[in-house]
């Protein structure tokens, strides 16, 4: 662990310190990272990287990531490498959490298993639903979000790069330590402080990305329907429709242009914590996560990714998003911008840590995460 800290420190300060210092070469740093778990060779192994972070919600903190690439079968010559990553964090605000992400490919890429999950204890704010609720910065309620989320999906190949998926969504939310000195926004929702949502997902996907965690070429088109009902354990009955399209263009051996369009739409008795968000560490970076939420959200962004020397890289992006309480109003309401720049460090082949700075309307924030934003 100490070797990881030392290697990362030397990398970040190398070009800004006095030339009179005798700094280690890139080859020496590669060797140190290899011994710390960041080997750039062709063998399969785990990679460990700790580091600081800052987000608008969590404040400053420290986290760590463990990522690995593996092949479930050595006889499979078609599937791309499978990846499994864990990350954890603690912050100065008292927040703590663990995230899990797995992309597994089997049987000559005819079967896939994707899993995202998280457990967290995070002091945050609830602003209410809609654009104007998010704009009123003083009209909010502080609480501690105690949350557990699991999203497994099994995909079966239909033809070529087209897959049908069957999944499940579990979301457990409890609003602890809520501030009762101001507006009781959470207590006045129909569901109250504790919400349990459980639903079955049906997914149709066209996916020919060359490497799912960090594509250079290809596209992803995804249509997803999730139905939450009491029969599946959910407190309320509602539907969630998600549309996603992203494209990746390799402009040169050092440049990639990536862009995406997203739509999240809901109907039924949607709990306050399950309303689609406009702003997180993947989309609409620069906004406090959870400040803007409504029943229907649309967003898009374009990002230019440039590889510098050795393991370094930079990105820049532009994005915009909107939301509305009804489907026919979506696109005719207020639009919010997102713009930013970021630094990339390739601690394992095709797997990056990213430090992004996003600017939104009247807000901004830093993000230290593993993997690309999309």
Predicted regions and their residues:
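Solvent-exposed loop/turn segments connecting transmembrane beta-strands
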Residues: 52-63, 88-98, 108, 194-195, ...
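Membrane-embedded beta-strand positions of outer-membrane beta-barrel proteins
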Residues: 48-50, 84-88, 113-117, 164-166, ...
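Gram-negative/organellar outer-membrane beta-barrel architecture
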Residues: 38-47, 54-192, 294, 352, ...
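Extracellular loop and loop/strand-boundary signature of outer-membrane beta-barrel proteins
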Residues: 85-87, 135-140, 184-191, 227-233, ...
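Outer-membrane beta-barrel "beta-signal"
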Residues: 201-204, 341-347, 363-374
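Transmembrane beta-barrel architecture of outer-membrane proteins
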Residues: 94-98, 119-121, 144-150, 170-174, ...
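Short loop/turn motifs that connect adjacent beta-strands in outer-membrane beta-barrel proteins
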Residues: 21-23, 34-44, 72-81, 107-112, ...
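C-terminal outer-membrane beta-barrel translocator/porin domains of Gram-negative envelope proteins
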Residues: 190-193, 200-308
């Amino acid at each position: 662990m100490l070797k990881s800290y030392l290697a990362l420190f030397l990398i970040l300060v190398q070009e800004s310190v006095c030339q009179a210092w005798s700094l280690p070469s890139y080859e020496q740093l590669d060797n140190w990272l290899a011994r710390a778990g960041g080997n750039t060779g062709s063998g399969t192994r785990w990679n460990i990287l700790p580091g600081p972070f800052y987000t608008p919600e969590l404040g400053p903190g420290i986290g760590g990531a463990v990522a690995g690439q593996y092949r479930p079968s050595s006889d499979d010559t078609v599937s791309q490498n499978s990846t499994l990553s864990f990350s954890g964090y603690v912050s100065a605000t008292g927040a703590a959490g663990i995230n899990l992400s797995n992309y597994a490919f089997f049987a000559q890429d005819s079967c896939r298993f994707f899993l995202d999950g998280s457990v967290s204890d995070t002091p945050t704010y609830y602003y209410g639903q809609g654009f104007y609720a998010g704009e009123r910065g003083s009209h909010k309620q502080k609480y501690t979000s105690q949350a557990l989320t699991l999203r497994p999906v099994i995909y079966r190949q239909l033809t070529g790069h087209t897959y049908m998926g069957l999944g499940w969504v579990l979301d457990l939310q409890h609003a602890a330590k809520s501030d009762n000195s101001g507006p009781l926004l959470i207590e006045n929702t129909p569901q109250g402080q504790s919400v349990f949502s459980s639903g079955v997902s049906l997914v149709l996907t066209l996916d020919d990305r060359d490497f799912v965690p960090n594509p250079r070429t290809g596209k992803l088109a995804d249509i997803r329907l999730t139905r939450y009902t009491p029969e599946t354990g959910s407190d309320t009955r509602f539907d969630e429709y998600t549309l996603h399209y992203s494209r990746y263009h390799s402009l040169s051996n050092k440049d990639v242009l990536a862009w995406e369009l997203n739509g999240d739409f809901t109907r039924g008795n949607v709990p306050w914590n399950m309303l689609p968000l406009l702003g997180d560490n993947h989309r609409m970076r620069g906004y406090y996560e959870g400040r803007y939420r409504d029943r229907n959200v649309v967003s898009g962004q374009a990002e230019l990714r440039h590889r510098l020397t050795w393991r370094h890289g930079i990105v820049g992006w532009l994005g915009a998003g909107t939301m509305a309480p009804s489907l026919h109003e979506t696109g005719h309401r207020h639009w919010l911008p997102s713009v930013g720049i970021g630094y990339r460090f390739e601690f394992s082949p095709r797997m990056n840590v990213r430090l992004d700075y996003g600017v939104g309307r009247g807000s901004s924030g830093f993000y230290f995460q593993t993997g690309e934003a999309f």
